[in-house]
Design a protein with these regions (language model features):
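C-terminal alpha-helix
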Residues: 61, 132-135
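Short acidic-hydrophobic, aromatic-tinged amphipathic segments that line or gate anion-handling sites
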Residues: 122-128, 132
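STAS-typified acidic loop motif
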Residues: 4-5, 14-56, 75
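Amphipathic alpha-helical interaction surfaces in cytosolic regulatory modules
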Residues: 45-123
């Protein structure tokens, strides 16, 4: 966890903010152009603090009724090894539910975390969000 993330958590705790530190950094929405697709986005650092929220986001996306879920990691600045590993299980779970989980990363350090964990080969490479939605 970075110092910035830790300080952010402390500030939220002192202010009795009911949201977790990761609450403003992860979201999902159905695509307006491609109604069978759901876009999930993770912004900032995805470290051990946000891991449970990340798993919850992936689970919610699989149960939304969309045929395709595109996980957009272009704004993710750090991906911990456990979060990268969680993608392997999420890919299998999605497949069992009849959902295709696609990934757009864009950053070299995020790609490296995916390669180290052996997860990268499970996902086709999509250079942009649009190609992940249209293919």
């Amino acid at each position: 966890m970075s110092v910035t993330t830790a300080l952010h958590q402390i500030e939220q705790h002192r202010g009795n903010d009911p949201r977790t530190a990761a609450a403003g950094r992860m979201w999902s929405r159905r695509s307006t152009e491609y109604p069978d697709c759901l876009i999930a986005r993770v912004e900032g650092e995805l470290d051990a603090v946000g891991l449970d929220d990340f798993r919850a986001l992936l689970g919610h996306c699989q149960r939304d009724g969309c045929r395709v879920v595109v996980l957009d990691l272009r704004a993710t600045t750090f991906l911990c090894i456990r979060a990268a590993s969680a993608l392997s299980g999420a890919k299998s779970d999605a497949w069992r539910h009849g959902v295709e989980l696609r990934l757009v990363s864009g950053r070299r350090d995020i790609e490296r975390a995916l390669q180290i964990t052996g997860v990268r080969h499970q996902f086709r490479y999509f250079p942009t969000l649009r190609t992940a939605l249209t293919d």
